[in-house]
């Protein structure tokens, strides 16, 4: 997406799957409205993380992420989280992940699920790039360092696979995509069969907000 996010100035390009200021604000408002209308929430997750850097810090993205977690935690409505593909770093738990709140009923993964703090290549570069430069300048053999980097990448890859995520409790179950709809239907049915409280349809704000937004966009 060109010229997005706006806080990065001219020439900025938004990356799909990355969380920016507007997205965090919009999700925060949506969770608040779902809580008010007593609507259970299904989170579908494929994210490479929250935007980082000096511009992101000045735009208060960390504070907005904390605000989203606070809204989820205080919503009082049941929620499930499905990691469709990537669930990376803080973005994983601010998007309804089980690590960040007590409203998560359960979490599901797919055959493509990958949950980690960062990918192995990024971790290896962060840990060993300066050592590589230093050894290369000193004329020291860099192959042992490269071997360590490759070993770290393999370890990160192995510990972010769906089977490891299920074994270590990052997800409660790995589900085939054709069966995913049945899990969502069962969750929503349970939520409505035994609600902590209800909101009458004519008192709901969310349908009216969505309708007003669509009308505004068409105009």
Please provide the spans of the model-predicted regions.
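Ligand-binding clefts of soluble mixed alpha/beta catalytic domains
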Residues: 1-219
């Amino acid at each position: 997406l060109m010229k997005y996010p706006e806080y990065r100035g001219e020439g900025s390009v938004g990356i799909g799957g990355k969380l920016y200021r507007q997205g965090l604000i919009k999700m925060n408002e949506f969770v608040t409205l779902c809580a008010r209308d007593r609507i259970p929430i299904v989170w579908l997750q494929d994210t490479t993380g929250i935007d980082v850097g000096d511009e992101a810090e000045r735009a208060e993205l960390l504070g907005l992420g904390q605000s989203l977690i606070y809204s989820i935690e205080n919503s009082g409505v049941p929620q499930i989280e499905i990691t469709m593909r990537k669930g990376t770093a803080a973005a994983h738990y601010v998007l309804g992940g089980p690590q960040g709140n007590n409203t998560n009923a359960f979490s599901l993964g797919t055959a493509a699920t990958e949950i980690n703090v960062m990918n192995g290549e990024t971790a290896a570069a962060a840990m060993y790039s300066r050592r590589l430069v230093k050894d290369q300048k000193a004329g020291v053999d860099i192959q042992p360092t490269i071997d360590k980097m490759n070993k770290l990448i393999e370890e990160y890859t192995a510990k972010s696979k769906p089977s490891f995520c299920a074994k270590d409790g990052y997800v409660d179950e790995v589900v085939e995509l054709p069966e995913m709809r049945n899990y969502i239907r069962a969750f929503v049915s349970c939520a409505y069969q035994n609600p902590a409280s209800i909101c009458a349809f004519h008192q709901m704000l969310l349908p009216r907000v969505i309708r007003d937004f669509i009308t505004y966009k068409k105009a």
